[in-house]
A protein has these predicted regions:
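Short, solvent-exposed coil/turn segments at beta-strand boundaries
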Residues: 25-26, 74-78, 98-105
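A solvent-exposed, acidic/Ser-Thr-rich amphipathic alpha-helical stretch
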Residues: 27-72
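Short, surface-exposed coil-to-beta transition loops
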Residues: 66-67, 90-96
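Short beta-strand segments that buttress and anchor functional surface loops
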Residues: 81-88
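Short, well-ordered alpha-helical segments enriched in acidic and aromatic residues
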Residues: 6, 18-33
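Short beta-strand edge/turn micro-motifs at domain boundaries
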Residues: 95-119
């Protein structure tokens, strides 16, 4: 699979609620960084850290969260995804940047509209 196919497969797993499948595409020591200064901002090491300390909180914090992928650009082992996120309390655009090595995501940088995200998380 290409890096782009791996990344897009991850969004499919996320949309289906398949966290086990999503976790399989992350390197065990993956570096995950969420920009901003809100409760989910920061650095996560490995998928389990990301799952337990970020993803597991999303259903309660962002009810009915959905991602609409607008565009995907891949060059070499880097993939960038432009996304429109909606939830009951959120309408936001973001960019996700991935590094894929040997079939696994080793880096995942989340560039959200952190002001909108902070407002949604605090509400």
């Amino acid at each position: 699979m290409t890096p782009k196919e791996i990344v897009l497969g991850g969004y499919k797993s996320f949309a289906e609620g398949d966290m086990e499948g999503l976790g399989k595409i992350f390197h065990k020591d993956a570096y995950i960084k969420i920009n901003g200064d809100h409760e989910l901002s920061g650095t996560y090491r490995g998928f389990d850290d990301f799952l337990n300390n970020c993803l597991a909180k999303l259903p309660a914090k962002l009810p009915n969260l959905e991602a609409d992928i607008l565009n995907t650009i891949a060059e070499g082992n880097r993939v960038c995804v432009h996304i429109h996120w909606t939830a009951d309390n959120l309408d936001m655009y973001s960019i996700h940047m991935f590094v894929v090595e040997d079939g696994l995501e080793t880096e995942f940088h989340i560039f959200d509209d952190s002001q909108k995200m902070a407002e949604a998380l605090s509400g």
